Design a protein with these regions (language model features):
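Polybasic (Lys/Arg-rich)
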Residues: 195-288
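Core beta-strand-centered patch of the WYL/Sm-like small regulatory domain
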Residues: 92-213
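Beta-strand-connecting loop/turn residues
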Residues: 25, 32-34, 150, 172, ...
Length: 288
């Protein structure tokens, strides 16, 4: 006869005493392997674990060693029986994983240090490398962090000529940070809304909010609606749809629409139509 470990009430008492809250628990004993398995509804399920792992790998945002460490830690929350299966399901993706280049020593440490400054409403000075590799040291007020297309971005305001202007900084290009004793206040109605920004901006190129209308003749209308969250179909015809969207005007939305090739034709506003025409003409010149 095989003796079993303490009953579930004792296990639950032990975990509660040490700060665990696991909800509905189930303990099973596998006689073939002589192992006890503990499962709880607040642990990640196998499906949840696989989904999170796949999403993490697709971001390409962390160095290889950091990605491996993070996935190994997450696997500890998966069901014990299927850890091996989960490893098998992602091992080829991890083997071929190609992270994006970063300049900072530790992206995760950077993120948390910035998050603390945001939460404490604390002014900071960052050492930052721009796209052209030039270095700047800038005193800013950090407001939010967002993730977009492989990179984390810090949204902050910077004082220029007595005015606080919004700026975006890639977190992986911040190589040093000094926290100052100066704190700032943000009125409730003036708080930065990163959710709203994410629904309107493309590729984190800044600009003013603008409503645009364009025709789309591509095979998947839903794909373009998903790519531009604040968009809707306002007219359907046999071979095309007309879409209205609220976007951040600038390079980002042009990149998105141009990526659809001849499937897109911008209808309004006229100023944006002219910008798109000019961009297409520049592209044509490169092929002449």
């Amino acid at each position: 006869e095989t003796s079993l470990p303490p009953d579930i009430s004792e296990i639950k008492h032990f975990m509660a005493e040490y700060g665990y809250s696991v909800g509905k628990e189930e303990v099973t004993f596998d006689r073939s392997s002589q192992k006890m398995y503990f499962e709880a509804e607040k642990f990640l399920t196998n499906g949840e674990m696989l989904a999170i792992t796949k999403i993490l790998i697709a971001t390409r945002t962390l160095p290889q060693d950091k990605m491996n460490q993070l996935i190994e830690k997450l696997e500890e929350f998966a069901s014990t029986k299927d850890k091996k299966r989960l490893k098998e399901l992602v091992k080829r993706e991890l083997y071929h994983y190609k992270p994006v280049a970063t300049l900072c020593n530790d992206l995760i440490d950077n993120l948390y240090a910035l998050a603390e400054a945001i939460d404490d409403k604390q002014e900071i000075t960052i050492t930052y490398y721009k796209m052209d590799k030039s270095r700047i040291d800038r005193r800013i007020r950090p407001l939010a962090i967002v993730f977009s297309e492989y990179y984390f971005y810090l949204i902050a305001v910077h004082e220029t000529d007595g005015e606080w202007k919004e700026r975006y900084y890639r977190v992986d290009r911040i190589t040093d940070m000094i926290k100052h004793r100066t704190h700032f206040e943000v009125e409730y109605d003036s708080r930065f809304d990163e959710g709203k920004l994410k629904n309107e901006i493309q590729y984190m190129w800044p600009g003013k909010e603008q409503q645009i209308v364009f025709e789309f003749t591509g095979p998947s209308v839903q794909a373009i609606l998903d790519r531009i969250p604040k968009s809707k179909v306002i007219k359907r015809e046999k071979d095309k749809v007309t879409i209205q969207a609220t976007v951040v005007h600038g390079t980002g939305i042009k990149m998105t629409l141009l990526s659809q090739g001849s499937w897109v034709k911008v209808l309004s506003p006229q100023s944006f139509v002219d910008e798109m025409k000019e961009e297409v003409e520049k592209m044509m010149e490169r092929y002449r």
